[in-house]
From Swiss-Prot:
Membrane topology: Peripheral membrane protein
UniProt GO molecular function: ATP binding; proton-transporting ATP synthase activity, rotational mechanism
Organism, as annotated: Gloeothece citriformis (strain PCC 7424) (Cyanothece sp. (strain PCC 7424))
PANTHER family assigned to the protein according to its UniProt record, in alphabetical order: ATP SYNTHASE DELTA/EPSILON CHAIN, ATP SYNTHASE EPSILON CHAIN, CHLOROPLASTIC
HAMAP family: ATP_synth_epsil_bac (MF_00530)
The protein's assembly and partners: F-type ATPases have 2 components, CF(1) - the catalytic core - and CF(0) - the membrane proton channel. CF(1) has five subunits: alpha(3), beta(3), gamma(1), delta(1), epsilon(1). CF(0) has three main subunits: a, b and c.
Protein name: ATP synthase epsilon chain
GO cellular component, one term: plasma membrane-derived thylakoid membrane
Pfam families in the record: ATP-synt_DE, ATP-synt_DE_N
Amino acid sequence: MTLSVRIITPDKIVWDDEAEEIILPSTTGQLGILSGHAPLLTALNIGVVRVRPGKDWQTIAVMGGFAEVENNEVKILVNGAEAGAKIDKDTAQQEWNEAQKRLDEASKSGDRQKQIQAEQAWKRARARFQASGGFVQV
């Protein structure tokens, strides 16, 4: 038995297909979903959704949102999403490195708003790099 998975942003459907398994970046940690999972509603962090439609895993960078699981259907509503296969790994790594520098600078500045904005940009860049197949040491 498989899961019906839909990943939806405000302007497009990023994924609409069957999957054997899905791993979500919930606000309480990584959450694995298989068919027959109990009904669930969870908030999602900025991170990487991992979907296994067959033998291989697909990655999708998501920019926070919510996921609902019910009757082998997984509906994921996110602010933004990008398939890992469409992200250039070198560009994503460069963006992540630049975001890390901006975060370090913002941390030293003492400006709380600047720190929060830099941290959000860093999380988005990290998610894109991880989804592209890059390894990020935390």
